[in-house]
């Protein structure tokens, strides 16, 4: 007997249409995830070395350095390697790496997400893999391309030589740096230089003025500390740029696949004009020739960073798509009587709760399946997104000799960038 699953896509339209998928029993083999550790390096490389995938998300050095922030887990399934993590409170999966039945693995991910009461969110889906997604998921998904997360990929030789008219300005930067600081030198990154690199990172964090930006760079600082603490285990290559005995720039990276090297981090003291250009050139010129390409990662929508990355004349911009597919069962709508709008608000509130409190999946599932109702949830929506929410849980108590209906307020949460703007006061007065 073939089981029938019903999938609903929140927020697509105002209708209550359901999409029915017939699923083979083999798709229900569970994924055995475990927290990513240093011991997984050889496992990851086994899948990524010859996969031809060049996106920076698959660099083991990145995966490990950021694992605490994203709570990254890994599993093997049906010839594929899968990463599961949390992005801004949303359960998410990287597009699987490997060879096998694509429809089977995508269905397995959908079922895993459903088991954890989440819709399926796939990240890092490159354009060459979109045919597999479309074939297996059909209309049962939404696709979004975000230019801010496109990877900048360069020819190694181009960055090493800076030849040609278009890179004349870069050569000028290098020559000016050499003229200003004739006592400069480049050294391989070793344990000797790690304290100075961390000190430069600390000063970089402290230079930020905006509080939201400070939080973001503080997270990157922690990732840098974690990577440098395990430099050898992660197979990092790196370099430092010195003027006299002062470290004015450092960088490091690691392979993504056989022909592509990822520059994970590059930091420089901006007081030393041209330091960024010089550390980049010196480092890349020493990479093995097997690496035809160098990935210098995303610009994250930062205008200055985008301008700088484009100025090096990338060979390609690797677009990465996010794919969203809901796998909540039909009962969520029919039995609970939620409208599509209420359903979407529930998922967004759940994601915000997870982002703010970091509760376990067991607790989240318990609350949002047994206690949550639209009536108990007060939220503020801006541009289609829940930016603040709180829960009003009913209870009764004796007050002044009378049995009075009360509400206990809990789950008070606000998007980080919206804090300090009076949103919770507005909510409490609703």
Language model feature labels by segment:
Residues 144-152, 315-328, 397:
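Conserved catalytic-core motifs of GNAT/GCN5-like acyltransferases
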Residues 8, 18, 25, 45-55, ...:
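Secondary-structure boundary/capping micro-motif
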Residues 24-56, 161-223, 327-394, 401-408:
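Short amphipathic alpha-helix that is part of the acyltransferase structural core
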Residues 222-239, 243-319:
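Accessory, usually C-terminal, subdomains that scaffold auxiliary metal cofactors
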Residues 57-129, 242-272, 347-421, 425-426:
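Conserved donor-binding loop and adjoining core beta-sheet/short helix segment
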Residues 281, 425, 429:
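Residues forming the Rossmann-fold NAD(P)(H) cofactor-binding site
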């Amino acid at each position: 007997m073939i089981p029938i699953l019903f999938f609903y896509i929140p927020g697509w339209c105002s209708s209550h249409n359901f999409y029915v998928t017939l699923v083979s029993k083999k798709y229900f083999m569970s994924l055995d995830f475990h927290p990513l550790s240093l011991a997984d390096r050889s496992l990851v490389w086994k899948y990524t070395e010859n996969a031809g995938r060049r996106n920076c998300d698959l660099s083991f050095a990145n995966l490990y350095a950021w694992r605490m922030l994203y709570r990254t887990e890994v599993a093997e399934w049906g010839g594929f390697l899968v990463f599961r993590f949390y992005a801004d409170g949303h359960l998410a999966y990287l597009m699987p790496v490997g060879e096998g039945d694509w429809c089977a693995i995508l269905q397995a991910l959908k079922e895993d997400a459903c088991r954890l009461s989440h819709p399926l969110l796939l990240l890092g889906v490159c354009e060459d893999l979109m045919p597999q997604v479309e074939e297996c998921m059909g209309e049962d998904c939404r696709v979004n391309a975000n230019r801010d997360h496109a990877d900048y990929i360069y020819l190694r030789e181009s960055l090493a030589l800076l030849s040609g008219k278009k890179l004349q300005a870069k050569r000028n930067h290098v020559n000016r740096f050499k003229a200003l600081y004739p006592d400069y030198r480049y050294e391989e990154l070793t344990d000797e230089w790690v304290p100075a690199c961390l000190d430069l990172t600390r000063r970089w964090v402290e230079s930020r003025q905006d509080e939201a930006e400070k939080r973001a760079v503080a997270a990157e600082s922690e990732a840098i500390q974690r990577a440098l603490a395990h430099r050898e285990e992660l197979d990092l290559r790196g370099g430092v740029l010195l003027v006299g005995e002062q470290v004015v720039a450092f960088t490091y990276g690691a392979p993504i696949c056989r022909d592509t090297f990822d520059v994970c981090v590059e930091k420089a003291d901006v007081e030393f004009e041209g330091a960024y250009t010089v550390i980049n050139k010196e480092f890349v010129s020493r990479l093995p020739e097997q690496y035809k390409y160098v990935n210098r990662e995303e610009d994250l929508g930062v205008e200055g960073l985008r301008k700088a990355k484009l100025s090096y004349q990338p060979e390609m911009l690797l677009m990465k798509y996010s794919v969203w597919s809901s796998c909540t069962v039909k009962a969520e709508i029919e039995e609970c009587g939620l409208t599509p709008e209420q359903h979407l608000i529930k998922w967004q509130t759940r994601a915000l709760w997870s982002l703010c409190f970091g509760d376990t999946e067991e607790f989240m599932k318990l609350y949002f399946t047994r206690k949550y109702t639209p009536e108990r949830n007060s939220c503020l929506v801006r541009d289609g997104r829940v930016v603040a929410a709180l829960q009003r849980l009913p209870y009764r108590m004796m007050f002044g000799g009378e049995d009075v209906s009360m509400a206990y307020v809990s789950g008070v949460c606000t998007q980080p960038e919206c804090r300090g703007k009076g949103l919770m006061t507005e909510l409490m007065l609703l």
